Amino acid sequence: MVMIKWMENKHKGRNGSSHDFQVMISIIKNGTSKEGAEKRAVAVRFYHSKEKEITNTGRLQIGIDEETERIYFASASGTKGYKLSGSKKNVRVVQFMPDDLSKWESYVGGYVLQQDLDCKLFYVDISERRLV
């Protein structure tokens, strides 16, 4: 089972307002989280320093290899302007994908995530904060 939790932060700084948010991806095995099941979680932070609300319709692509418990991320089309970061041993942050999907081959991360990984793929809708 995969769970997603959102955390948002709005603040004003020297360069104007900033709106960032973090998405926590959890893999839960052997029961529910309330039952103390084994859980592997990782946080990924998006941030946008421009004076814009996050109304983007882009999607974040998540690949989960349940056997090795590694989590792979790549931004999907429409998420330009956001930076993706993750820093855990079981996480591999993959490069941003171009909007033009025909150019994926030149973006190694997107190509690897689509073609070479034996993992389940999920998408998070950024504007609606949910799995799609």
Question: Can you say where each PLM-predicted feature lies in the sequence?
Answer:
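Long, compositionally biased stretches
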Residues: 1-40, 56-85, 110-132
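Short beta-strand-centered segments at strand-helix junctions
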Residues: 38-55, 87-104
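Low-complexity, intrinsically disordered Gly/Pro/Thr-rich segments
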Residues: 100-114
